[in-house]
A protein has these predicted regions:
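N-terminal small/glycine-rich loop or linker at the start of catalytic domains
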Residues: 1-4, 65-79, 112-116
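Active-site acidic/histidine proton-transfer and metal-coordination neighborhood
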Residues: 16-17, 76-178, 188, 255
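Glycine-rich, proline-tolerant flexible connector loops at the mouths of alpha/beta enzymes
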Residues: 33-57, 112, 116
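Histidine-acidic metal/acid-base catalytic patches
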Residues: 1-4, 9-26, 51, 58, ...
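Basic, amphipathic N-terminal segments that precede the first structured/catalytic domain
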Residues: 22-25, 29-36
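Short coil-to-beta-strand
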Residues: 27, 60-69, 97-110
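Flexible loop residues that form catalytic
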Residues: 35, 72, 113, 212, ...
Length: 271
């Protein structure tokens, strides 16, 4: 498995000097939360901004994994909002797919902006399938893939578990919608079971290693990274495992990143 880390572990908007140090630790990939590097992630984001960020990453010997935290700075964008919101969400996701492509990335992990609220489960499923079919058609030439991130019940009321994510993927029927797993959500959804991993084997393209509160990996004691890593190895997963941790200290964030790397190396056969 290939070790990566999200840029949410780094200072907002100004962190490119950290990339060589992360490479020296053993990280290979950077997962990009767009709002962590750009104040305007949409219409004010120029191709030169994207190219400069990619260059800084690649000059350090790293590679962009893809994007996550897609709508963090756009709470108005909702999968189950009104017609205007849904249309804008579609446009923004297509835009981010292009950004991901231009960064050299592959995966777009969609977690926020998809609470269904009063929308019934069957209607939400149908609307999500219709939305993703349109989005996947629009982005088919980008070489990117979207993943609905299965989240725990406290974080979302839509796609709580890999079974739901796989059902949507199968109904959409497009090659650029695939599966992702999140360590914390696996625990919260009771999915740390080999059968769950076996069922995801053929379509799993990305893994988030994380903790409650997005703490440094291994600190909470609530996530069995050893077991999750073993189950991933047992299905032959060899892709990126990304440390999804937030910046907890303005002065010690590099040591926190190093601590998380050691967890990836120890339990995910990474590095």
């Amino acid at each position: 498995m290939i070790p990566a880390i999200s840029n949410i572990a780094l200072p907002a908007f100004d962190h490119t000097e950290a990339f060589p140090k992360l490479a020296d630790m053993g990280y290979v990939g950077i997962e990009v939360a767009p709002s962590r590097i750009w104040r305007d992630t949409w219409r004010g984001l120029g191709s030169q901004d994207v190219a400069a960020y990619r260059k800084a990453i690649e000059d350090a010997g790293l590679t962009v994994v893809g994007l996550h935290s897609l709508v963090f700075d756009h709470p108005e964008l909702q999968l189950f909002g009104d017609a205007a919101s849904v249309s804008a969400t579609l446009d923004f996701m297509a835009h981010l797919s292009g950004v991901c492509r231009d960064l050299g990335g592959h995966t777009l992990i969609w977690g926020g902006g998809r609470k269904r609220g009063n929308v019934g489960a069957e209607e939400a499923f149908a609307r999500a399938v219709d939305f993703m079919q349109t989005l996947c058609e629009r982005t088919a030439e980008h070489g990117t893939v979207f993943c609905f991130e299965p989240l725990g019940p406290n974080d979302s009321d839509f796609v709580n578990g890999l079974d739901e994510a796989r059902a949507i993927m199968n109904a959409v029927g497009c090659g650029n919608l695939r599966l992702q797993v999140d360590a914390k959500a696996l625990v919260e959804n009771g999915e740390v079971e080999q059968a769950v991993f076996d069922d995801a084997r053929d379509h799993l393209v990305h893994v988030h290693a994380n903790e409650p509160g997005l703490d440094v990996l291994g600190r909470s004691g609530q996530i069995d990274h050893a077991m999750i890593g073993k189950m991933l190895a047992d299905i032959g997963y060899a892709g990126y495992v990304s440390a999804e941790q937030r910046m907890l200290s303005e002065t010690d964030y590099m040591n926190d990143a190093r601590e998380s790397y050691e967890t990836l190396r120890r339990y995910y056969d990474a590095g």
